[in-house]
Amino acid sequence: MASLLAEPMERLGARVVGIDASERNIGVARAHAEASGLAIDYRAATAEALASAGEHFDIVLAMEVVEHVADLGAFLGACCALMKPGGMMIVATLNRTPQSFAFAILGAELLLRWLPLGTHDWRRFLRPSELAAELRRRGARVAELVGVRYSPLTDRFALGADLSVNYMALVELA
């Protein structure tokens, strides 16, 4: 959903454009932002549409979305086209490992019901090397990788070296 990081980024002083292909999701995000006193430019659009319109941004955030898009290459190509020269993109996604199957599918969907069943298809998760290869084909490179871990005991996320479940990639144009 478009508001995953849009509201926190706006609160930190960024000028935010939040997009989602779903008009319904954008409506929910707009209502929440307005109730919070935030003026976020939410649009029911795709990255491909924004790139075709010639839009450019200092930072592009693709958070927990690449494992859901129909055409990964087209999506990443559009995201790269949206980056201004010297800009960056952050991609957050799930690695395709036995650990990610255990935590994201069995744990989050089946046992804990944090997500609706079928939200994820493990076969669509991307190994960091696969993401890097897709980005290279689009004139970009992964500058840094960092793992993301969630602790249910503290209800907090932490960054680290373990890429086995969730990870983020800092992407720059090559």
Pin down the residues of each PLM region.
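Acceptor-substrate binding/catalytic loop of class I
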Residues: 93, 110-130
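Short low-complexity, flexible loop/linker segments enriched in glycine and/or proline
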Residues: 32-38, 106-107, 157-161
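Short, flexible, mixed-charge acidic loops at enzyme active sites
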Residues: 100-110
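Core SAM-dependent methyltransferase catalytic element
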Residues: 140, 156-174
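Conserved SAM-binding loop
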Residues: 1-100, 128-131, 169-173
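Residue-level recognition of beta-strand->loop/alpha-helix junctions
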Residues: 20, 146-147
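Class I S-adenosyl-L-methionine
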Residues: 148-158
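Short alpha-helix
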Residues: 122-145
